[in-house]
């Protein structure tokens, strides 16, 4: 179900997101990194980021199941079609990634909903990929298997 959020998007003061320059991010790849994994987070901008209780009323709507009365409901997670969802998602993911420690041999770089895992060798690359996938799953993030580029010396 997709809720029409045009009125909410007009009423809410827009955030002014800063999207990082991909060239700057790529400049952070350690010189020792020779193996990489790229993960694209699926349905990234919604359904995995909880809404603050004080904001949930903004996303209330009425729903009527066939043969039932109208019910008022509200989203408790970031809904699809909310204008600031990409920015809010990026902030939440960035905060979560602070808790992820790949040790001295690994580095993770984020660009919106894409992650680049950098490792010096194949063994570390495999360990880092598994560690990141488990971490993301524990936090409720979903990875697109179709777009994943796992443990490679060259990624696009």
Residue ranges of each PLM-predicted region?
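Retroelement reverse transcriptase polymerase core
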Residues: 1-156
């Amino acid at each position: 179900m997709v809720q029409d959020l045009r009125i909410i998007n007009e009423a809410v003061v827009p955030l002014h997101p800063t999207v990082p320059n991909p060239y700057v991010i790529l400049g952070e790849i350690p010189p020792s990194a020779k193996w990489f994994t790229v993960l694209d987070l699926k349905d990234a901008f919604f359904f995995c980021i909880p809404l603050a209780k004080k904001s949930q009323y903004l996303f209330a709507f009425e729903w009527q199941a066939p043969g039932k009365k109208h019910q008022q409901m509200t989203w408790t997670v970031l809904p699809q079609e909310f204008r600031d969802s990409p920015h809010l998602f990026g902030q939440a993911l960035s905060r979560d990634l602070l808790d992820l420690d790949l040790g001295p041999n690994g580095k993770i770089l984020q660009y919106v909903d894409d992650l680049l895992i950098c490792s010096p060798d194949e063994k570390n690359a495999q360990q880092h990929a598994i560690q990141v996938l488990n971490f993301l799953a524990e936090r409720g993030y979903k990875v697109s298997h179709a777009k994943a580029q796992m443990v490679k010396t060259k990624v696009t």
